Amino acid sequence: MSQKVNIKKLNPDACIPTYGTEISAGADLYSGMPEAVTVMPGTTEFIKTGIAMEIPAGLVGLIYARSGMACKKGLAPANKVGVIDSDYRGEIIVALHNHSDNPVTIEPKDRIAQIVLAPYITADFNEVEELDDTERGEGGFGSTGTK
């Protein structure tokens, strides 16, 4: 399934997101920085993509780490999963945190993260005095694995 998403380049050298294969869920986002940026160990750098998106209503853009960058270089989004709402029209910026012990340099046009467009449901939150009982109840943090 495909959906048209309008993209505005905020600088002429910015890269439009690309899919690695025909059926990839995540599209690669690229560094739109004019120069290389080095992310020192234990620090976070905000990497501009040079693009803005018009995500259709009913969809959300979810920003995830690229597995190779996270596993091989230790770079991943600082907020774990970034959320791009459909009414946001500003530049997409990825906060990359270096979890490794080595500096990592991001060159212009390097792939830095991936975006997945997904449908979502908004809730009509309803305050109540009591919640319906379930077998699980209040058990959490691994409680279902103790039976």
Q: What residue spans do the PLM features occupy?
A:
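DUTPase catalytic domain/fold
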Residues: 1-147
